[in-house]
């Protein structure tokens, strides 16, 4: 599996490259849409010790400010001229297993991965589907039409 790396900060909505690509009004509206979805996804993730039931957003157990599911970013995608929203990919966040998926994607889509490390016994862990990004977008979708209503003057 190939990984493409880039500096995501160059695609923040206040950068000139983004404003030139979609215009000031388009950048502002895409930024608001990304912000709405990010806020909705973050608020659906609860910090607690218990495991969330399948079908509900996952519980967040980490106290770290960086290595957590709540660290959600949104950036401009110049290829699609759209906004990309999701949890930050951390180094070492890929799990062993057949599809080598990341923890956020396992929560969103469900699946299996090999859990354990160098000194721990390795075992297959089955993740139930606990979506949080898809439902956040569905909740915020009705607001999007109003964003572009009077954007071109």
How would you label these PLM feature ranges?
Residues 10, 15, 40, 65, ...:
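Generic alpha-helical secondary structure signal
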Residues 15, 22-33, 37, 137, ...:
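N-terminal small/hydrophobic-rich alpha-helical segments that act as secretion/targeting modules
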């Amino acid at each position: 599996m190939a990984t493409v790396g880039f500096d995501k900060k160059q695609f923040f909505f206040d950068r000139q490259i983004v404003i030139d690509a979609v215009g000031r009004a388009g950048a502002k509206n895409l930024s608001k849409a990304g912000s709405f979805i990010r806020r909705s996804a973050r608020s659906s993730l609860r910090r607690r010790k218990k495991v969330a039931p399948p079908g509900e957003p996952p519980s967040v157990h980490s106290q770290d400010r960086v290595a957590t599911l709540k660290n959600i970013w949104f950036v401009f995608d110049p290829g699609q001229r759209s906004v990309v929203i999701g949890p930050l990919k951390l180094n070492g966040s890929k799990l062993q297993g057949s599809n080598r998926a990341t923890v956020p994607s396992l929560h969103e889509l469900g699946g299996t991965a090999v859990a354990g490390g160098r000194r721990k016994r390795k075992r297959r862990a089955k993740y139930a589907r606990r979506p949080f990004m898809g439902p956040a977008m569905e909740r915020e979708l009705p607001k999007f039409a109003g964003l572009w209503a009077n954007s071109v003057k």
